[in-house]
Amino acid sequence: MSAPDTARAAPSAAASADEAVLSVKDLRKEFVSKRGRARVKAVDGVSFDLRRGEILGLVGESGCGKTTTGKLIMRLIEPSAGSIVVDGMDTADLGRDEDFAYRRRVQMIFQDPYASMNPHFKIKDVLEEPLLIHGIGSTRAERMKLVERAMEMVKMTPASEYLDRHPHMLSGGQRQRIATARTLILNPLIIVADEPVSMIDLSTRAEILHLMKSIQAQMGLSFVYITHDISTARFFADRIAVMYLGRIVEIGSQDEVIDHPVHPYTRALIEAVCEPESGRVDTIRKLEITGEIPSASDIPSGCRFRTRCLYATEECATLPEPELKDIGGGHMHACRRWKEI
């Protein structure tokens, strides 16, 4: 695709199934407290592949490390250890020019669209800015054509009604559409979407997710979808990775993870979600998580979930932490007692 274009041909089914555009291996990020007394393990050995044209959901409670993982992929912060390979390029080996190109190919949709926009800019300036930074379009007329095309993709038409407005003049849903358009305008390979619908009203969330899913299919994009809401991950993602205290504890297709969860933490997340059934709202089952999430500077021995798990035994504390185990079809989990529960 040439630089001014904003559409990408959808990949073949074989490419979507087999080709990894993002490979994360043993990724780690430690933060040191201001006094240097504590080392916070925000991301603690995360590994996964993202296939071409795939949506991977990273799901977990606040503090599980999912947003930090997204920032590491975006190179907004540097990893303490591990590797991130995008389309065959190891990000640790990128020079200045390669890093600049990388930031065009890997884009982020932020949780708060208003905070990510200059309030003094008009919408046309918000969308033109990335084109100027990356030298796309030799004239403003060319760039405005790309701006209008991006706005058409996110259903903000006619564009003339919005171009001269400022961000505060738009609704939350409209701002998120503009944030999505700004990401798409650079024709990225991968989009990291960090809680993209959590700050807009419930009635608009499904609409925005439908829009993003349609655009993803049309352009053949790969998404890392970060969310605390496993119900939106079920709708939006092809695969789901459940994170707890810096590690992935279960990963697989969304059907397997949601319909046949193995790890007790995954089960608790799912069972806490209310879904409409037979005209009323019911809780699926009753399985509560006890206590608070431990500090990432003092991770429990053995299984890190054991302090909140209803099924934990002494061996969960004394034996080494369980590694991810494949139980078939790429469905992996990290629970030693999964057959018993």
Region roles according to the model:
Residues P4, A13-A20, K34, S160-E161, ...:
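Short catalytic/signature loops enriched in Gly
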Residues M1-H260, K339-I341:
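ABC transporter nucleotide-binding domains
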